Each structure stands twice: as structure tokens, then as C-alpha cells.
Amino acid sequence: MGLRAKFLTVLVAGILWVGCSGGSTEDAYIEQAGVIHQNALTIDGHVEIPANYATREVDPGRDNDFQVDLPKLLAGEMDSIFLVIDPGRTASDTEDIASMQAGTIRGLEAIHRLAEEMYPNEFEIAYSADDIERIVGSGKLAASIGIENGLMIGHEIVHIETYFNLGGRYMALPHEIHSEPVDIEMFPGEEFDEAGLDSLHQQIIAEMNRLGMVVDVSHLSRTAMLEAVNLSRAPVIASNSAIRKLRDHSWNLDDDQLVALRDSGGVVQVVAFGALLTEDAALRRREYNNIRGAFGMIPGQQPEELGAEPYEDYMGRMEALDERYPDATVADFVDHVDYAIRAIGIDHVGISSDFDGGGGIPGWNHAGEGLNVTIELVRRGYSEVDIEKLWGGNLLRVLREVESVALRLGES
């Protein structure tokens, strides 16, 4: 149950996305969703952090340009987040791996700095499912830790225990067995390596099971994903994936993968990443980047900085882009949630944003807008119990089951 200061009453009207229809039925949905959202223990299963996180440059306690910060989390009634460290996607030699290892440690230290030095009254690191519930019950935000890419382990399995002891509670397997596209806007027919698991990957899974660290199968090749699910002695998660039947992308999960995930006892955390939800959103993202490139814009540069005439040209192109390739919506996102529930049951589906890692859609584009997801779920007939499972209950169950497997392995 969320125990943050309750801002929903005054914020509901302000955060609803454009196009929400009026009328008594819609008002009833909004009112019902507000109550459910307040009462649920809400967990965002995947939020990425930048390399300079928890510094003067990137202060998570202040309202800033990032999609997740303390004011937005409070406004959105979020109770818990998985802060995810992405140490990099490729490593060609031992020097690269050492650099990735150092980056992972810096990320872990940054999250500890956030919770233990900068904002100890607002955040606390959660090391278990029970910790999440205890921390939320105390009125703080529970900060759990995920790791995007296990490639930095190299051939030294001992690093996994180091990351676990510092709070890492899920980790994606190394990216050399990932279905890693050249860009996120790939389309049907653009397939990538179907590499499977080797003995090192098997050792990594065994060690994660022993420790009680959740195996994250998002973005693996199809072959590697199915092998990982079968090898793991504990349930697995896909921390930021969507549904391949609705958007044919190799990062998304097909029906066989969904069933395998369910049979492991795991959860797919459906991600609000537009290019993984609709093809139009992928085309939009590609064209958007092309437009910015044509104006020589650097990351973070605002169009107002272009000057009067280029600004008008830029805005004209953006208006045309809006008409040609509409962005994915909260309804599109919940379409993927719906499909997963029909395919494998509501006990195996969760929610993640991938905020500050490319995620976010109109209506749920920062941590302050999570209520809009709950409104759409209510609109489609989901009950309070259903919504509580989707927003965090199912993920908590997986964490507990993974912890239990580790205890049993330790006793054997």
C-alpha cells in the first residue's frame, strides 16, 4: 500500500493525457482508479540510471529533466522502483570488461549514495521482497537494484556475489547471447544471432540461483531465452519486454516464450517503450532522430535553441511527423498487457517503464503519470486485486520464490 503523501486528488485532472473523454462513466473510472492506485504497492520494474547518477549534476531528489526523480515519484504514488545499471553493451577485450566492471561498481555506489547519504529519509535500499514491504510501510521509497548486462562478469563468476552483496537483485545475462539489434526501430525480417547458452552462461545461472538473484531474460536471443528458462531452478523475469504477436521485434516475446516464462513461475514485465509497442512508434522514433540530425542537434538540445527561422521549420516537420506516425499510447501499452494476460494468466504479468533508458509514452512519460495506466486497466474491467498483481504483487512473488530456492540450495 502506497504511503507517500497523497497528491492524487489534485493531480488527476492535470496528468490525464489529451483525448480522455468526459462523462460520468469516465469520471467513475478515474475515481475508482485513484483509490486503487493509492492502495496498491506500486513497483516500476525497470528504471535506468545515468553514469553520473546521485551527483550534483544528476540529483534524483530534485525535479529535473529525467523521467524519474523524487518529486515525480511522489506525485505518481510510486512506492518502489528497480534502479537499473547498464554498464555497456559490448566488450572486445579484457580492458573493456574491466571498464564495465568499474562502471557497475560506480552505479551500485551511486544508488547507495542516494539512499544512505543524500536522501536517507526518502529512500532505502531493498534487499528482499520483505524489505520492499517494510520500507514502503515505513513511508519511504524502496529502491531495488537491477543490472542490465552480465557481460562485465567476463569469466570471473565471483563478481556476481560482489554485485549481489551490494544489492543487485536481478541481472540480465551477457549481451553476446542477446538478440541485440543495430537499433531499436528494427522491423520484421531483421533477425539477429540465435546464439544459445554455453558452459559459462550455465555457471552464471547456477550462481544466481544459489545467491537468490533473479535471472532476467529480456533481449536474449530466442534460443538463449528458452534455454535459460529451462536451466534456471528458480523463476525468471523479462524485466522490459513486450509482445511479439503485436509488434514483431526480436526483443519481444512470442507465445512459446511467454508459456515457458509462465511454466517457470516467472513474470513478463511489459515495458512502455513505444518502439516495442507499435510499428508506427518505431518509424516515428527513427524519423525523429533523422530530423534532429538534419538540424545538427546534439542530445538534450531543445528546439528553442535553434533560432527563430530554424525553429519554425523544425516544428513544422514535427507536426507532419505527428500526423504520419502517431506515437504509441497508454492504450497500446495495455493492449500488450491484455495479450500477455490472455496468453499466460494474470499471475505472470507485470509493468515496467524503462524510463531514462528510452521508455515512456504519451500519458506515461514520467514517474508522475503512472495513474494513467491504472485508469486504462480499470476502463478495461480489471479488478483491484488484478491491478495490485500487475503493479507489483506478481514481481514480489517471484522475488520471494527466488529467495526460497536460494535457501533450499544452501541447505542441500
Question: Predicted regions span which residues?
Answer:
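Bacterial N-terminal signal peptides that target proteins for export
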Residues: 1-8
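Charged catalytic cores and adjacent phosphate/nucleic-acid-binding surfaces used
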Residues: 2, 234, 243-244, 368
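Bacterial N-terminal signal peptides
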Residues: 9-19
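N-terminal hydrophobic targeting/anchoring segments and the immediately downstream early-domain regions
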Residues: 20-194, 244, 248-412
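Active-site-adjacent beta->alpha loops and helix N-cap segments on the catalytic face
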Residues: 182-186, 197, 224-228
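Alpha-helix-loop-beta-strand connector modules within alpha/beta enzyme cores
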Residues: 196-208, 228-236
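Substrate-binding cleft of carbohydrate-active enzyme catalytic domains
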Residues: 203-217, 223-227, 257-263
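Conserved active-site aspartate in kinases
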Residues: 240
